[in-house]
């Protein structure tokens, strides 16, 4: 862990919620018809119990960062199908004066040479998919820089739910049961997550006392127990016993990095993302391409609008898959991939009437998301994740620590910038988003869901900036998900005429009923005298506030 930085109380200015009006309509045209929350303080995430944990911190005098941390910690208990203590995390914070980015993703163990994997892909499960978990360092770093309440206070709701239990929600129960066949035989999984030999049912009480005890150790040591203490020793011992090469020295070497965000202008807004190794640049590339089309002249759910978005996303992913990696190993800087002339040239590759395969250009030389905002003007966009549901499936016995499988995103090909290597960060799917206008905060937002995430960022921004939809309608609207080549899946909420026309243009289109494949958006929009907070109906989520 890095030394505790100075808090930023001195350079924060008190912000009155002014100068930002709502540039959208107040219609809710989709079948969900969920309404936004309007309040001076707000927390949004995919689980109501977690949102209320954050709200409790605000009510006790904490700020939005305290609320975000408490929400994130509680999510490790009440939504274990998507994240845990062994997750990674990223965050963007508006402190009242400027943005701060935090990259708390972990690096590969020192023993992960290409030769260690024999030229084969990093597996998706087991200890050899686990990079150093970074979520704990994110909580500690965010609190050290911005927190107001005592660090241990932020853990209290999660510890209570771990010890006394919580009632499992229908969505979490469904995802839990669906993942059991994949993870049942991973070391430690059944003991932690199948105490009755099965996944819990909706409405059943689930207790996680080992998890609660671990959170108490983390709270008492500000995370040191996880990276250098008793918990680190347990992680190493479990790795040694199960064929992994992660060592206590890998955990001790971990650091979370404060970074400047990267950004792109879109229709008068500036969209901010965390720089690589994260894939936020995919959203910025796609939006930069769409800047060259008059999207506002096209109906929101028309084939013309959706086709252009799909084609822009394909081009953006082609570049990301070729060039994006740990930023210390990239041959190209993000600035070159976001060059306006380059994006203009990429836009010319789009055929308005036909789906085309996408190739990288040559520029010159399960996840949880949460957002919180307070009456002082502090806003937080934060995301943490195991990657594939329960991640690696590995759980360290007696600790409740379930471990992510972020190593699965490394490449095996020699010469690829994202090739697996010692102490290297892999390409990362989780991306918090933030929008400003003329240097002032407008919206903190995210769309969880693997490679859906940048696609969701693009679709939400197009709906708001081009089609004038309010953030709740932008969350509710039907979505597409590009898969590969010309393969696209769409929600059934699109008009039949749109789906038929997309097929006519050459998209290999499937429609699916499983809305969980299309991400889950949470967003907070800054109004003149408070916030508009929204939660996606595709999850159990809630916008809470006062």
Regions found by a protein language model. Name each.
Residues 20-21, 292-386, 399, 406, ...:
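Internal maturation/activation junctions in enzymes
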Residues 77-94, 98-101, 245-247, 378-443, ...:
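Active-site rim segments in enzyme catalytic domains, especially the processed small/beta chain
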